């Protein structure tokens, strides 16, 4: 009779015997790859440097807030992700910025195809002078998105928490909606092509408190499906809705990045604490 012990013998591939213990081995977990990664990212407008040596890893299906004083490079960084800076003749981008491991500035990357993967919502609601339906369906048509467009439009409006308010008037003009409804329409338009990332540049700054609250609730819901990166001047908003916060300060430098609770409750850098507590900015 063979006695059971904590040590067992396994036959190796070369015929030998390898002793292994019965103790459980813990395999270190590898952190998931970030959706967006920047390394040594610099942006220049002519001779003026807008971003300097930015390193950041943005995680999947979380809300990452970008905060900092005016002119610190927040929106410039956001526009790098979907190459909106390409439209500025004097802009020059150095360094690496990857989306799921692919450098978005590689010559083989089509900016139009990139923007299908990376949707964007701007500061001011900007619905097209079209019907509510056509506002959402427009991106599907120009990007040749397959599938039932009626169904996609409805799903997008539902995800943007707008369907119940407009389902009876899809042929009405999008510009006739209230400001908050217009912004949610723009969000529906941005998510209709089913992007991986949703960029939001001060999406609630032009809205009243009620509409702002609706958009904030929506952002938290959208993070269950999308990676959301939001630029905001409203630090209370960043604290309420984001999982991660990046703090840019003068000169386009990313000074601190981490969990939002840690950034707001116990920042590592004095300048970050001074900015958050309103001593400058």
UniProtKB/Swiss-Prot annotation:
InterPro entries according to UniProt: AAA+_ATPase, ABC_transporter-like_ATP-bd, ABC_transporter-like_CS, P-loop_NTPase, PstB-like
Domain ABC transporter: 36-276
Annotated ATP binding sites: 68-75
Membrane topology according to the record: Peripheral membrane protein
Pfam families xref list: ABC_tran (PF00005)
NCBIfam families reported in the protein's UniProt record: 3a0107s01c2
Enzyme class: translocase
Record's subcellular location: Cell membrane
Amino acid composition bias (Low complexity), ranges on this chain: 15-28
GO annotation, cellular component aspect: plasma membrane
Catalytic activity: phosphate(out) + ATP + H2O = ADP + 2 phosphate(in) + H(+)
Function: Part of the ABC transporter complex PstSACB involved in phosphate import. Responsible for energy coupling to the transport system.
Subunit structure: The complex is composed of two ATP-binding proteins (PstB), two transmembrane proteins (PstC and PstA) and a solute-binding protein (PstS).
Region listing for Disordered, in residue ranges: 1-34
The EC number(s) this enzyme carries: 7.3.2.1
Coiled-coil features, chain-numbered ranges: none
Chief localization: membrane
Name of the protein: Phosphate import ATP-binding protein PstB 1
Family from the record: Belongs to the ABC transporter superfamily. Phosphate importer (TC 3.A.1.7) family.
Highest classification ranks of the organism: Archaea, Methanobacteriati, Methanobacteriota, Stenosarchaea group, Halobacteria
GO biological process: phosphate ion transmembrane transport
SMART domains: AAA
Annotated transmembrane regions: none
Keywords in alphabetical order: ATP-binding, Cell membrane, Membrane, Nucleotide-binding, Phosphate transport, Translocase, Transport
Alphabetized GO MF terms: ATP binding; ATP hydrolysis activity; ATPase-coupled phosphate ion transmembrane transporter activity
């Amino acid at each position: 009779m063979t006695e059971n012990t904590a040590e067992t013998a396994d036959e190796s591939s070369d015929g030998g015997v390898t002793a292994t213990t019965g103790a459980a081995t813990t395999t270190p977990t590898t952190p998931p790859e970030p959706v967006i990664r920047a390394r040594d990212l610099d942006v220049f407008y002519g001779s003026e440097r807008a971003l300097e040596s930015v390193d950041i890893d943005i995680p999947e299906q979380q809300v990452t807030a970008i905060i900092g004083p005016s002119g610190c490079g927040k929106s410039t960084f956001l526009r790098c992700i979907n190459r909106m800076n390409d439209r500025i003749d004097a802009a020059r981008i150095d360094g690496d910025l990857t989306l799921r491991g692919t450098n978005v500035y590689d010559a083989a990357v089509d900016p139009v195809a990139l923007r299908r993967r990376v949707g964007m919502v701007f500061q001011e609601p900007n619905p097209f002078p079209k019907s509510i339906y056509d506002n959402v369906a427009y991106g599907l048509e120009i990007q040749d998105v397959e599938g039932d467009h009626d169904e996609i439009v409805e799903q997008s409006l539902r995800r943007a928490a707008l369907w119940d308010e407009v389902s009876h008037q899809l042929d009405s003009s999008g510009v006739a909606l209230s400001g908050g409804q217009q912004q949610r329409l723009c969000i529906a338009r941005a998510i209709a092509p089913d992007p991986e990332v949703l960029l939001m540049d001060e999406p609630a700054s032009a809205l009243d408190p009620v509409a702002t609250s609706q958009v904030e609730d929506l952002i938290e819901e959208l993070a269950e499906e999308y990676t959301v990166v939001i630029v905001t001047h409203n630090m209370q908003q960043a604290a309420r809705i984001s999982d991660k916060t990046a703090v840019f300060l003068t000169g386009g430098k990313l000074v601190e990045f981490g969990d939002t609770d840690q950034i707001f409750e116990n920042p590592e850098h004095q300048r970050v604490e001074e900015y958050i507590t309103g001593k400058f900015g």
